[in-house]
């Protein structure tokens, strides 16, 4: 029997769990996707919850299906790594049992009462103009919500984890998690890549104690090994090494090969993001941290559109169900049909613009944010709306590029595109034209899973370090070149309309918010 020569990556998203097998050159050898249905429960408006065991059971189902399809594959697995959605919180009691459902990253609930910061911190944040930002940070904290609204559950909580930490415990029995998974409302020191120091204000702002949090492990290091129960659930041998990787976006950047500052990773996922990776810590937005990269001693500069390609799902559900049905009948993706329908429409959608700020933010956009469609005339069709959504997301990501370049003084000269939306040729071409840069797909759209696999490959000693592994395991796919005429049109719409559209509409959004929230 030959030595194990494959890596298992588990990618836990909001809507599905994927079990992926890669080789040492980054080729995707096998793939199973198990849907999470429903993706979450909303017992009240703004809430988003899911039973954490649903994710664990889906991992087992996906793995067992892999081995059923290719029985010899399980014996070839040398190690595994995990990547998950960010900022989904799980609380467990002393026995390790979840207390209630996991609070999803999509959740918008706010705690009515939060811990009161010492006067010195309140004064400092007020002087810096950060009082509202810190208040929002506290109110969005799942731990603070539990303390205020479910005190019995809060008192019982022995462990406060992100979904990644919960799943690491399910796999290994250890209370550990990846450094690069710590994106959420936690007392984490992003610059030092560790839990905050004892005197840090975050311990006074969030109702979490240090002993409730897991041990953190750098990417590429071993988190533990499969225990007996996990091995049985996954159909793999006891003792299989489990390596630290990172959150989905961090792994996506690594799995796209965007490991130097001049290369940007654009992720066209539920949340659309633009990231660059660098060794130096730099806050692109003032007082908004750079996140730990999925490799040691590196950080990602990230700008996000919270409701990114979620807008595509929203459009299909609300305005294009007939297209979805037609696509199912033809056994095609609905996005492929929509691509065909928008192809004849000229760049700029005949003057229809979408401002993709569908969800409020903390700083940019602010809590008043609303989405907008501007420029309707009688020539516009549903296809125009769809194209304008893709263009609006591209404009928003270009704005993110310019903020990153301005803050870091590093020009972005290369665009690697990943996420489900990258499978759309129209979305790729629009990005190339709006950015006036060549847009490159990776050889696989499973870039988060590939980023996790790179970490396992480094941990197994197959490659010297993360950048060397990325050079060997990430390969260029299809390339989309900017078209001069489209670039000129998009430049005018971006510079003359889009860049100041939010500022012009902000007072209107504030008035809408005041009226809509009035009793």
Residue ranges of each PLM-predicted region?
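Active-site phosphate-binding/coordination module
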Residues: 45, 53-56, 69-140
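Active-site nucleophile and cofactor-binding loops and adjacent substrate-binding regions
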Residues: 26, 50, 78-84, 103-106, ...
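N-terminal phosphate-binding loop and adjacent alpha-helix
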Residues: 32-74
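Phosphate/pyrophosphate-binding loops at sites that engage ATP/ADP/AMP, CoA/4′-phosphopantetheine
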Residues: 59-78, 150-154, 199-209, 232-234, ...
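Gly/Ser/Thr-rich active-site cleft segment
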Residues: 12-14, 25, 126-247, 355-359, ...
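A polyampholytic, Gly/Pro-enriched intrinsically disordered region
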Residues: 53-55, 119-135, 235-236, 262-265, ...
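ATP-dependent carbohydrate kinase catalytic cores
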Residues: 189-296, 329-336, 340, 401-404, ...
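Glycine/Thr-rich phosphate-binding loops that ligate phosphate moieties of nucleotide
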Residues: 1-34, 78-116, 220, 276-519
């Amino acid at each position: 029997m030959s030595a194990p020569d494959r890596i298992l990556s588990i990618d836990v998203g909001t809507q599905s769990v994927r079990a992926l097998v890669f080789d040492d050159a980054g080729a995707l050898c096998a793939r199973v996707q198990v849907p999470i249905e429903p993706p979450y429960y909303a017992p009240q408006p703004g809430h988003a919850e899911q039973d954490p065991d649903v994710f664990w059971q889906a991992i087992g189902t996906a793995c067992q299906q892999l081995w059923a399809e290719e029985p010899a594959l399980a014996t070839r697995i040398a190690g595994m790594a995990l990547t998950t959605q960010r900022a989904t919180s799980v609380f467990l009691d002393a026995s390790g049992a979840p207390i209630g459902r996991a609070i999803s990253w999509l959740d918008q609930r706010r705690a009515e009462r939060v811990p009161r910061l010492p006067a010195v911190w309140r004064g400092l944040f007020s002087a810096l103009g950060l009082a509202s930002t810190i208040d929002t940070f506290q109110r969005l904290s799942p731990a603070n919500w539990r303390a205020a609204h479910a005190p019995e559950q809060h008192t019982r909580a022995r462990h406060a984890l992100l979904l990644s930490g919960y799943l690491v415990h399910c796999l290994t029995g250890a209370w550990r998690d990846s450094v690069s998974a710590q994106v959420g409302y936690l007392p984490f020191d992003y610059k030092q890549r560790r839990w905050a120091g004892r005197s840090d204000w975050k311990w006074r702002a969030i109702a979490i104690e240090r002993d409730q949090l897991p041990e953190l492990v750098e990417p590429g290091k071993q988190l533990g090994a499969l225990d007996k129960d996990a091995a049985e659930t996954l159909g793999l041998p006891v003792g299989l090494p489990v390596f630290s990787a990172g959150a989905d976006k961090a792994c996506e950047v690594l799995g796209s090969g965007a490991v130097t500052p001049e290369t940007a990773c654009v992720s066209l996922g539920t949340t659309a993001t633009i990231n660059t990776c660098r060794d130096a810590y730099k806050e692109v937005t003032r007082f908004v941290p750079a996140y730990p990269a999925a490799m040691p001693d590196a950080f990602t500069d990230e700008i996000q559109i919270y409701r990114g390609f979620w807008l595509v799902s929203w459009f299909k559900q609300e305005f294009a169900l007939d297209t979805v049905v037609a696509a199912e009948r033809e056994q095609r993706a609905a996005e492929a049909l929509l691509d065909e329908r928008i192809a004849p429409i000229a760049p700029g959608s005949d003057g229809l613009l979408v401002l993709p700020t569908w969800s409020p933010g903390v700083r940019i956009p602010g809590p008043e944010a609303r989405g907008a469609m501007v420029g309707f005339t009688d020539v516009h069709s549903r296809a125009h709306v769809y194209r304008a959504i893709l263009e609006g997301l591209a404009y928003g990501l270009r704005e993110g590029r310019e903020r990153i370049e301005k803050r870091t003084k590093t020009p972005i000269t290369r665009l690697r595109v990943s996420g489900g939306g990258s499978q759309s040729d129209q979305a790729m071409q629009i990005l190339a034209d709006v950015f006036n840069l060549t847009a490159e797909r990776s050889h696989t759209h499973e870039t988060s899973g590939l980023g996790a696999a790179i970490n396992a490959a480094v941990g197994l000693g197959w490659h010297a370090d993360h950048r060397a592994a990325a050079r060997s395991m990430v390969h260029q796919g299809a390339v989309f070149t900017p078209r001069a005429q489209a670039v000129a049109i998009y430049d005018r719409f971006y510079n003359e309309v889009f860049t100041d559209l939010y500022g012009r509409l902000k007072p209107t959004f504030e008035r809408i918010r005041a009226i809509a929230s009035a009793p």
